[in-house]
C-alpha cells in the first residue's frame, strides 16, 4: 500500500474506534466526540509497537484542514445569534461566562510559574481541562511559530490526560452547587417559566377600532408618529369588508385595524387610534389569505422591502419576518436575506405572484452552495495569517487557522448574503462538515500523542498533569457558580447551561437537560454564551502562549 492509502486506512480505523468509544456512556455521560482522541492514541500505540511510520507532512495537513472545517462551520452556525447574544438579556450570562474563561487563564499562568510546567504542557492541559479542541489547535499553531519543538505530541498527551476530568468536573460542579444551595428543581423550573413569560417580547397582535374623530379622513401615513412606531397594519375591516391597507388608504371612524408588533408599542397605538375591538379580522371566508413564503431567489438578496413595492403593485403586506428563528417587525429599510420566512397577507393570486418574485423554493434550503464555503475558508485563512505587531512581543499576534476562519464565518453568517452568494448552510450539512473536521483533527492529534501516552500517564509527571487539569476545570466553575447563585440570583437550570456553555461541552449540556426533562432553560443559556466563549477559547491560548513565552 502507498503511504497515503495507509494513512487514510488508519484514520478510518481511528474514527470508527474513537466514535465507538465516545458512544459508551456511564450513567448517561460519555466522552462523545472526544473518544476519537483516545481512539487515535490506541492506534498510535499499536503502530509504534510495530514500527509503522506515518508521513508527518500529510498528517499535519489533515490536522490543520480538519480544524479549519470545524471552526468555520461553528462560526456559520452561531453567527446569526452571536452579536444578538451580546445584548440585553445575554449580557449577564456572557459576563459570568467571561469570568470562567478569565479565571482559567489566570490559573494557567499561575501553575506555569509556580510549578515550572513547560508551556506546551500547560496549554495542552488547559485545552483538555476546558474540553475545547479548537483551543488546542490554536495553541499548537502559535507555539510552532514561536519556535517550539515536538509541540503536537506533547500538547496532545497533556490534553488527553486532562480531558476526562474536564467532563467530570463540570458535572461535579453542578452537583455540588445543587447540594450546597439545597436546590428544588421543580421550583427553579417554575420560577424560570414565570420570569420568561414576564420578559417575553415576541410579536403580538391587536385589533383596534378607530374612534378618534381627529383621524377620520386621514391617510394611514398621516397618523401621528406613524413612522416612529414599528407596527404593521396588516388588515383593515370596514363594515363587513376586509381590505389590505397601504400608506395611502383613507381611514374612517369605525374602521377596525389589525396591528402586528411588540405589546408595548401596540398599546401606544391603541391610545392614539381608539379602543380595542373584539372583532374577528380573520381572512377565512374572504378573498384574502395569510400564508408563509421563504426567500430563495438570488435576485432579491440584499434588496430592501420597499424596493419590491409589494403594497403598491400587488396589495400584499408582509406582516412578519422570521430570520434564523427570530421574529422581526418588517419595515421598508430591511434588506432580505436567503432563508427569511415572510408572512404574506393579500389576495391568493397576488400572494402567488409575490411567491414567484421571492422564490419560495423550499428544496433550496436543503442544498449546499459550495462556492461561498470556500470563499469563506479562503478569507478566513488570509485573515488568520495577517500579522499584528505589538511592541515587546517576540512574534506577531495572529488569529491563526483556528481564529481567522471563525471570525470570518461569524461576520459572513451575520451579513447573510453578498450579491448572489449566501452563507446559509442547512443544519444537517453544517453538522456533517463540523463532525468531519473535528474527527480528522482529533484523529491526527491522537496518532501523534499515542506513542508515549501510557508511560506518561502512569508516571508521577502524568499524575501531576491530571491534578493541574482538575484545578483549571473545577475552580473557575465552582467560584463562578457560587457568585452567580449568591450575587447574580441566577436560576439553577440556567446556571447549569451556563457552566456547560462556558466549557463548550455538549455531554455536560445533555446532563443538564436531564436534570429537568423537557425544560429548555439549560439549552437556552448554553446557546447564549456558546458563541462568545468559543471565540475566547480560541484567542486565549494564543495570548497566553505569547505572554508566557515573552515572560520566560
Curated annotation (Swiss-Prot):
Record carries keyword Lipid metabolism: no
Top-level taxonomic group: Bacteria
Bilayer-crossing regions: 4-24, 29-49, 65-85, 95-115, 161-181, 370-390, 402-424, 438-458, 463-483, 492-512, 529-549
Membrane topology according to the record: Multi-pass membrane protein
Pfam families to which the protein is assigned, alphabetical: Asp-Al_Ex, TrkA_C
InterPro entries referenced in this protein's UniProt entry, alphabetically: AAE_transporter, RCK_C, RCK_C_sf, Transpt_YidE_put, YidE_YbjL
Keyword Electron transport attributed: no
Entry GO CC: plasma membrane
Domain spans labelled RCK C-terminal: 190-275, 277-360
UniProt record similarity statement: Belongs to the AAE transporter (TC 2.A.81) family. YidE subfamily.
Protein name: Putative transport protein APP7_1021
